[in-house]
């Protein structure tokens, strides 16, 4: 069973689309799940299944810790049910306007370095 990369992006966001396209190149190593963050957090969105308290905590955590990220990536281990935050910002080159804005070698390194169960995310 492969680990999963969960990509939280915004609709109509060209950077998010380019990141998603670049990360697809890792699909031989990971299952990839794309999540529209706005739809996810809508009142009737998928996050509603968590219940009001957990949903509120999740929204608060996103706002407090991930507001500096245009797109967020987590890796998930389905066997242990643990998640890890992946610092994608280190792999992005914002001077590029296509999927080459993601340096896949740096991203792979960040995926491997991401520690399960660490929250809030430690950023350098």
UniProtKB/Swiss-Prot annotation:
Assembly: Homodimer.
Keywords (A to Z) from UniProt: Disulfide bond, Electron transport, Host cytoplasm, Redox-active center, Transport
Localization per Swiss-Prot or TrEMBL: Host cytoplasm
Induction: Expressed in the intermediate phase of the viral replicative cycle.
Disulfide topology: 13-16
Functional note: Glutaredoxin necessary for virion morphogenesis and virus replication. Functions as a thiol-disulfide transfer protein between membrane-associated OPG128 and substrates OPG095 or OPG053. The complete pathway for formation of disulfide bonds in intracellular virion membrane proteins sequentially involves oxidation of OPG072, OPG128 and OPG088. Exhibit thioltransferase and dehydroascorbate reductase activities in vitro.
Name of the protein in question: Glutaredoxin-2
Tree of life domain: Viruses
Major place of residence: host cell
InterPro entries reported in the protein's UniProt record: Glutaredoxin-like, Thioredoxin-like_sf
């Amino acid at each position: 069973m492969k680990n999963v990369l969960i990509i939280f992006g915004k609709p109509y966001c060209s950077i998010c689309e380019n990141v998603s396209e670049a990360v697809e190149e890792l699909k031989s190593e990971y299952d990839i799940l794309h999540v529209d963050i706005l739809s996810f957090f809508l009142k009737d969105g998928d996050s509603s299944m968590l219940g009001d308290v957990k949903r509120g905590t999740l929204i608060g955590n996103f706002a407090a810790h991930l507001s500096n990220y245009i797109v967020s990536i987590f890796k998930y281990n389905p066997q242990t049910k643990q998640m890890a935050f992946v610092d994608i910002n280190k792999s992005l080159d914002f001077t590029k306007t296509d999927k080459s804005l993601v340096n896949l070698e740096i991203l792979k390194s960040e995926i491997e370095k991401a520690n399960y169960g660490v929250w809030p995310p430690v950023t350098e």
